[in-house]
């Protein structure tokens, strides 16, 4: 059985992850990606264009499925982030406001607090809704 995840990452970092076919969350810490398994669905929500001082974006920016294999620790100039391989779909950014009334994870009054964890589980309904919206607008 697949799980479905929402990762909170700046759009700039999402684009880099898509380019390299990887997921990296929570500033490279392993906890979030260790919860993911091959076949799990992954959606990115980007509150800003870049971290830490980017412009507000509040959009879903990528979607994919976790690939086979285990997380590994990369070594990038004194930075050793944990990563996993991902098969990304072609997608276009879609604003949170456009989908919010239909999303289950936004129905609680303080739903935004959970996003501070960086990686949160979402329902299959929310994953499918977001995936359909951001992949249907690509050429």
UniProtKB/Swiss-Prot annotation:
Family: Belongs to the UPF0310 family.
Paired cysteines (S-S): none
Protein name: UPF0310 protein RSal33209_2865
Pfam families: EVE
InterPro entries referenced in this protein's UniProt entry, alphabetically: EVE_domain (IPR002740), PUA-like_sf (IPR015947), UPF0310 (IPR022996)
Source superkingdom: Bacteria
Naturally occurring in which organism (per UniProt): Renibacterium salmoninarum (strain ATCC 33209 / DSM 20767 / JCM 11484 / NBRC 15589 / NCIMB 2235)
Gene3D superfamilies, per database record: ph1033 like domains
């Amino acid at each position: 059985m697949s799980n479905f995840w929402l990762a909170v990452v700046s759009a700039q970092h999402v684009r880099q992850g898509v380019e390299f076919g990887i997921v990296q969350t929570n500033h490279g810490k392993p906890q979030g990606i260790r919860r993911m398994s091959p076949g799990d669905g992954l959606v990115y929500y980007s509150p800003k264009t870049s971290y830490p001082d980017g412009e507000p974006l509040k959009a879903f920016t990528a979607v994919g499925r976790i690939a086979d294999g285990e997380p590994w620790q990369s070594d990038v100039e004194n930075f050793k982030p944990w990563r996993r391989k991902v098969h990304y779909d072609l997608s276009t950014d879609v604003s949170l406001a456009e989908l919010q009334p239909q999303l289950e994870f936004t129905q609680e009054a303080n739903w935004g607090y959970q996003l501070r964890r960086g990686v949160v589980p979402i329902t299959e309904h929310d994953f499918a809704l977001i995936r359909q919206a951001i992949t249907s607008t690509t050429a």
